[in-house]
Amino acid sequence: ALIRTAVRVGAIVGGADKREMQDLTEYGEKIGLAFQITDDLLDLLGDEKRLGKQVGSDLKKGEKTYPAAYGIQESKNRARELMESALDALSRFDDRADPLREIARYMVERIN
């Protein structure tokens, strides 16, 4: 919800019309979920020095995560699908949306 809200605020400030607001809201929802799944994956697979926290801390705390429910590969696949859907939501926009496209790719590809 935080990423979606940030994107919506930017759209409002930028003067988005109704259709653009819908597209940007969809982008924010999709990339927000992709970010969370990727964050859950990083908690399992990431480098502790880069993360700044102990790997596996979510698991140790008993937190419910996408990888715990669906497995690592399915989680990677789902994060990528969500990223692609987020990028598709930007298809009506020109290069003004390139920073959003770059952010979407970074959020998901940081696991690799």
List each language-model region with its residue ranges:
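All-alpha prenyltransferase/terpene-synthase fold signal
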Residues: 1-112
